[in-house]
């Protein structure tokens, strides 16, 4: 398997990357939440107090929280975004979003989007919003979108054959129809359960007019992959405001994201679980001290191995564990205290039964 990333970077000078613009008006960052609760699993939860702390920070630091539809339209139409643009999203339509999150978001007058998996709503799951609650959200201007019908693992399957693809698309289309039947027109957006996808699924969604969202970190710009848009997780261990501040202020590293390699590593089919990223700089004109570009793999720092003035590689120092892993790369923006950010998620899968998450 060829693990090649072709990046389009601005000029590097003294190890720092020159900014493309004076501000981030051509990109925006998306925050991802699940539960707003002190009793649900901590890994996907943030307390009401922590969540309000995030909202207050956005307010006092002049971030512009905008709705996702407007943000996407501005990028796709080449129109400027507000400076420091942020979008708020939730996955899974948990009831605590309605009970705990909605009052706070109304207090700050912040728009948001909820990605809904429809089966739990149909089954009257006590932890999930009802259709009446979702209708009330839509009436209040909240955007509702597709998170599949059952939150299944979409790509942890033995074979990626036509039968698999048809079943996966049926799942997505069923949820889209249920949302439309109950709520009226909804956008053709999909949030991948667990942020997991492969190239076949991305292409099928592109051909059917979907925009899709992962759970890898980073911002959104015109050069993004519209079937794998990144979002910054902001709950659980990612809820710490000190670390979140850096992410909020970051800009997406300019790159050809659609050229990123298939993120699924099939160890049962001979794929190696130490994937190598081969990075080609395409707009660098001058390269000075190179140490300023850093990558982090499963929490460990990995410096790039420079092959030439235009090429470097990054590889995990040891085999990645089963499940989801990320390569994150950052570089300081010249003249600013902020960073460019790039993330690529790998799924190491050997055909085993998926875990319960």
Where are these regions (language model features)?
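Short histidine
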Residues: 144, 213, 218-253
């Amino acid at each position: 398997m060829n693990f090649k990333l072709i990046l389009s970077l601005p000029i590097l000078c003294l190890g720092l990357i020159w900014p493309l613009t004076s501000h981030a008006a051509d990109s925006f960052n998306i925050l991802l939440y699940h539960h707003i609760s002190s009793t649900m699993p901590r890994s996907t939860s943030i307390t009401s107090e922590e969540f309000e702390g995030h909202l207050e920070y956005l307010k006092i630091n002049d971030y512009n929280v905008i709705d996702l539809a407007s943000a996407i339209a501005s990028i796709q139409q080449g129109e400027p975004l507000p400076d420091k643009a942020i979008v708020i999203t939730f996955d899974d339509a948990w009831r605590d979003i309605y009970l705990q999150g909605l009052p706070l978001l109304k207090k700050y007058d912040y728009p948001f989007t909820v990605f809904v998996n429809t089966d739990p709503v149909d089954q009257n799951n006590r932890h999930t919003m009802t259709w009446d609650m979702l209708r009330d959200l839509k009436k209040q201007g909240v955007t509702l979108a597709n998170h599949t019908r059952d939150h299944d693992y979409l790509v942890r399957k033995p074979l990626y054959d036509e039968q698999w693809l048809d079943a996966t698309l049926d799942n997505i289309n069923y949820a889209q129809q249920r949302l439309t039947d109950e709520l009226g027109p909804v956008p053709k957006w999909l949030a991948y359960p667990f942020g997991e996808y492969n190239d076949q699924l991305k292409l099928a969604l592109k051909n059917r007019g979907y925009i899709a969202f992962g759970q890898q970190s980073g911002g959104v710009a015109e050069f993004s992959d519209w079937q794998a848009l990144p979002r910054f997780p902001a709950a659980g261990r990612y809820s710490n405001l000190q670390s979140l501040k850096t992410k909020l202020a970051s800009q997406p590293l300019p790159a050809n994201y659609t050229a990123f390699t298939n993120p699924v590593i099939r160890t049962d089919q001979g794929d190696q679980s130490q994937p190598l990223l081969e990075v080609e700089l395409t707009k660098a004109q001058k390269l000075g001290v190179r140490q300023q570009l850093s990558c982090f793999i499963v929490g460990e720092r990995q410096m790039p191995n420079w092959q030439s003035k235009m090429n470097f590689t990054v590889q995990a120092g040891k085999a990645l564990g089963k499940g989801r892993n990320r390569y994150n790369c950052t570089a300081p923006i010249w003249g600013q205290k902020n960073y460019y950010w790039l993330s690529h998620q790998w799924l190491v899968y050997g055909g085993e039964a998926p875990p319960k998450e």
